[in-house]
Structures are given as structure tokens and as C-alpha cells.
Amino acid sequence: MVVDRKEEKKVAVTLRLTTEENEILNRIKEKYNISKSDATGILIKKYAKEEYGAF
């Protein structure tokens, strides 16, 4: 069985967070056992989908 995966080119992004925003990401990280980077990506995709209809 061959799985065809689409290669995605990723770009590095730097975010400056307030202490409160960082704490929220820490809570998400602990609750769902995912990295802050993954949590941020998920939140960006969720917002884009809600705001623009598709991502």
C-alpha cells in the first residue's frame, strides 16, 4: 500500500506573547499533551477556517 502525502513547505514564525497568553498555551500543552508550536498552529488554522471559510 502506497500513501501519497502532499509535501508542505513550512515557514518559521516568531511570536511575542504576554505572560497571560503564554500561560494559556501552557495549559493547552498540559491538557492535550501537545507542543506550544502545535497548539499555536491549530489555533491559527481554526481561526482561519472560521474567519475565511477554508484553510
Curated annotation (Swiss-Prot):
GO biological process: negative regulation of DNA replication; plasmid maintenance
Gene Ontology molecular functions: DNA binding
Keyword list, A-Z: DNA replication inhibitor, DNA-binding, Plasmid, Plasmid copy control, Transcription, Transcription regulation
Function: Acts in trans as a negative regulatory element in pE194 replication.
Family stated for the protein in its record: Belongs to the transcriptional regulatory CopG/NikR family.
Stated name of the protein: Cop-6 protein
